[in-house]
Amino acid sequence: MKNLMLSTAVLALAATAAVAEEVRVYNWSDYIDEELLAKFEQETGIDLIYDVFDSNELLETKMLAGGSGYDVVVPTGTFLQRQITAGAFQKLDPSKLPNKVNMWDQ
């Protein structure tokens, strides 16, 4: 499951980056290796603003306050339904994911 979420986050990041000079990411601390983040910036020329959280409560507080400005957020399932119901996230538009063919159907 962690690999699926990581793959989805990376593909969403790449799709978001395709139209941006900067991508803002909010993720669990130690979830993506800093070397991978640096490699992404180097290969794409896109600046990453990479903020981390260490608890579901911190994530939820920021997301439910609204206007976080993040392009990619990596939540966990524990609080996810409440955050979705509150409108904290936008639905992904598959037509804007050019690398969707590389994603699992699950």
Task: Give each language-model segment a name.
Residues 6-8, 31, 72-73, 106:
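Short amphipathic alpha-helical surface micro-motifs
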Residues 7-15:
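Bacterial N-terminal signal peptides
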Residues 21-83:
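Early extracytoplasmic/lumenal segment of secretory-pathway proteins
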